[in-house]
Swiss-Prot record:
<dbReference type="GO" id="GO:0086091">
    <property type="term" value="P:regulation of heart rate by cardiac conduction"/>
</dbReference>
<keyword id="KW-0630">Potassium</keyword>
<feature type="modified residue" description="Phosphoserine; by PKC">
    <location>
        <position position="102"/>
    </location>
</feature>
<dbReference type="GO" id="GO:0033363">
    <property type="term" value="P:secretory granule organization"/>
</dbReference>
<dbReference type="GO" id="GO:0060307">
    <property type="term" value="P:regulation of ventricular cardiac muscle cell membrane repolarization"/>
</dbReference>
<dbReference type="GO" id="GO:0071320">
    <property type="term" value="P:cellular response to cAMP"/>
</dbReference>
<dbReference type="GO" id="GO:0008076">
    <property type="term" value="C:voltage-gated potassium channel complex"/>
</dbReference>
<keyword id="KW-0851">Voltage-gated channel</keyword>
<dbReference type="GO" id="GO:0086013">
    <property type="term" value="P:membrane repolarization during cardiac muscle cell action potential"/>
</dbReference>
<dbReference type="GO" id="GO:0045121">
    <property type="term" value="C:membrane raft"/>
</dbReference>
<protein>
    <recommendedName>
        <fullName>Potassium voltage-gated channel subfamily E member 1</fullName>
    </recommendedName>
</protein>
<dbReference type="GO" id="GO:0071805">
    <property type="term" value="P:potassium ion transmembrane transport"/>
</dbReference>
<dbReference type="GO" id="GO:1902260">
    <property type="term" value="P:negative regulation of delayed rectifier potassium channel activity"/>
</dbReference>
<keyword id="KW-0633">Potassium transport</keyword>
<keyword id="KW-0472">Membrane</keyword>
<keyword id="KW-0407">Ion channel</keyword>
<dbReference type="GO" id="GO:0015459">
    <property type="term" value="F:potassium channel regulator activity"/>
</dbReference>
């Protein structure tokens, strides 16, 4: 069967597809997919349920962590120490004391002969070659 032009091919293919679909014979993948659309709604519902469960689980962990941070006692000595600036002032004082100690530990050794007689020639060691 030969068709003379392409305009007659489209109605021929449409009629052939309708006959095949009505007979329930060998149906293309697109036709099979249209029959299973009801099941795809259940798949989407399953995915949404799983995501919702993990979202709820994550939200619960996050809220319990935030709640535990709020329950810290404000009269706890460690929290009072951190909230105050006393530790910063003490840290500055300790740093300044260490700087002063390092300056005291440094000293210069003078050669008195070189200071008293700067014009005198100092002897040098000669190599033994």
């Amino acid at each position: 069967m030969s068709l003379p032009n392409s305009t007659t091919v489209l109605p021929f293919l449409a009629r052939l597809w309708q006959e095949t679909a009505e007979q329930g014979g060998n149906v293309s993948g697109l036709a099979r997919k249209s029959q299973l659309r009801d099941d795809s709604k259940l798949e989407a519902l399953y995915i949404l349920m799983v995501l919702g469960f993990f979202g709820f689980f994550t939200l619960g962990i996050m809220l319990s962590y935030i709640r535990s941070k709020k329950l810290e006692h404000s009269h706890d000595p460690f929290n009072v120490y951190i909230e105050s600036d006393a530790w910063q002032e003490k840290g500055k004082a300790v740093f300044q004391a260490r700087v002063l100690e390092s300056f005291r530990a440094c000293y210069v050794i003078e050669n008195q002969a070189a200071v008293e007689q700067p014009a005198t020639h100092l002897p040098e060691l000669k190599p033994l070659s």
